[in-house]
């Protein structure tokens, strides 16, 4: 029998999950594993003028407190854009790398300013309270028209007028010719600008990660709910300056993905 739109389909994967037999990242016991917490910038656009980590480092149960300065000192690489598209004029899009934490300027609210590694989550959260961060707020905008207006604050010097990509996937010449033919008949044409609202997927499970030393010295084992374990391994190997073969990514059940994982 051929199914049509709207007909129910028999799902084979649900019963195990409905019985509570799924295995998600939170179900994995890392043993005596440590916990990580992040201090995030409260401004949409600001300059980080001071960062004092010493009190947090002195807290009992804290193993590491680090900022982007520490990552730079350890030669941890930036995260690069994986997308490759061409602008309308045929030029390649300019790719800007992004540090894992704020390097002088944060460009969106929630950017990571510092990280804490501690015995448990409570200690890690307490250590965040001991970090003193000072900011110089900078002008920010919240819609696309304001972002490309004359005099708008520039997020990246590489992106003039805040335009990262001018991508066209249509036959502009053919479309214009069709409207011109319609105009010759005396019919009026109506123009409208359509701006898509920002859409953020929100799965029940966030994007947690468990990481630790692998079985062989110098290797890394990772558990995370991802729809792309190979790209995750490749990206992490690149920023950590490791051979990709030394990074093993294991994916348990994924608590909702929708493409963003």
What function would you assign to each model-found segment?
Residues 259-261:
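Short glycine/threonine-rich loop-to-helix capping motif typified by GTGT followed
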Residues 179-240:
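Conserved beta-alpha junction segments in alpha/beta enzyme cores
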Residues 32-35, 59-63, 103, 110-113, ...:
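Short coil/turn connectors at secondary-structure junctions
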Residues 61, 65, 173-182:
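Predominantly extracellular/luminal regions of secreted and cell-surface proteins
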Residues 1-160:
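Flexible, low-hydrophobicity surface segments
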Residues 68, 246-252:
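Beta-strand segments within the central parallel beta-sheet cores of soluble alpha/beta enzyme folds
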